[in-house]
Swiss-Prot record:
The gene is KPNA1. It comes from Pongo abelii. This is Importin subunit alpha-5. The modification Phosphoserine is found at residue 63. The modification N-acetylthreonine is found at residue 2. The modification Phosphothreonine is found at residue 3. Keywords: Acetylation, Cytoplasm, Nucleus, Phosphoprotein, Protein transport, Repeat, Transport, Ubl conjugation.
Amino acid sequence: MTTPGKENFRLKSYKNKSLNPDEMRRRREEEGLQLRKQKREEQLFKRRNVATAEEETEEEVMSDGGFHEAQINNMEMAPGGVITSDMIEMIFSKSPEQQLSATQKFRKLLSKEPNPPIDEVISTPGVVARFVEFLKRKENCTLQFESAWVLTNIASGNSLQTRIVIQAGAVPIFIELLSSEFEDVQEQAVWALGNIAGDSTMCRDYVLDCNILPPLLQLFSKQNRLTMTRNAVWALSNLCRGKSPPPEFAKVSPCLNVLSWLLFVSDTDVLADACWALSYLSDGPNDKIQAVIDAGVCRRLVELLMHNDYKVVSPALRAVGNIVTGDDIQTQVILNCSALQSLLHLLSSPKESIKKEACWTISNITAGNRAQIQTVIDANIFPALISILQTAEFRTRKEAAWAITNATSGGSAEQIKYLVELGCIKPLCDLLTVMDSKIVQVALNGLENILRLGEQEAKRNGTGINPYCALIEEAYGLDKIEFLQSHENQEIYQKAFDLIEHYFGTEDEDSSIAPQVDLNQQQYIFQQCEAPMEGFQL
């Protein structure tokens, strides 16, 4: 028997008669659920501050009342974005006016170009260190802001470019600037720190170790303009993100109280990033899940499953799904928030990734106790799951298969009969021909649970006939199980052999009926025998 762990929760001990709840509950598997791609599509880990059209025609005016318009004329960029000797000379001059003018010119290079010359900037000796030095100029907030903007855009680049900003000592200074009296400076510092934390787990942990959280959370305690709140919660989500390794929970858990009220902000960007942060914090052991539950966010997360923007629904669903990977009591908290009605609605979503995530979430609920399985039945969810099992994309069918097999593993006799009456046997048999060995095992396990119930019924009613054997044969399941006796996976062929021997008896095999392989559909093809037109000759 393999050792339990996050990566093998799904397939532990298939030789057992049933999976226990801890084994049936499944945390996310990166490989199967294509999370990295989805996250890239729905959430940016780095953002470049690009000048707007208005900013291209006039110098920026710091929004705080204490700022005055910079009295600097627009300067022409060098052809091709090349850094000129004049720019370098001005950046190192002692004149504050020339320093600001040159910094603005660097900023424009890094924010206006489709492919900003970040490498050229960081390879110019002393320039990055000079911008970091400008961050300290409390007497010149405009210079602080412009240099912070430059460094933000450098940190929006690749890991090597981000590391240059870190090595120049910018992070502790940016954290100090979170307490600046000027909101523009604060906001640009938040943006820079979000880019740095979003680069890698190593950068994230370094920013956390520099004690960013207290001043960052303090920003939320006052009335901010919307862009500030957006940037701050985005930076917060980057600080919570990452699994290899996750951030030290004690360092990020203080943000839970702030996240709980951010869920009630109406802006979709704020909502989305707050939900992403909660999904990261709830992705782990039960003690982390409990901390998220204790923050009082569950009911609001469930409400957000019905939001009209998928940008919010996706991370809210991820967070809800992570919470139900916990124990039965933790799962019940979500059920008590009327989550099943929302999940049923999401099963008909036109967005396939939402359907898949909803099926995954339900599969962890059906891994619970019989009362919880009954709530799924009462919510009329299984008909939708069986429909998905027959018609959806394969990645979604896989999750629906888990939901149904989990219910057959932990359900009562009446609950399993209900699933059979809904028609779960045929789609489970259809999965026996797919190339994904894990899902073949899931389907075999579900069928075994059904056959075991049939055996008990046969003994109880004295007929000696297992009523479910015939249903499996009618669905061409027996042919498929027989073929699996030659499967390359040892657990699959052993399971197939055991099922044939125990429930169907032994029959001579005909090698001529071995199925062909359809590589496009990732499954085997079983030819259905047809009678001759004139009928069989006796």
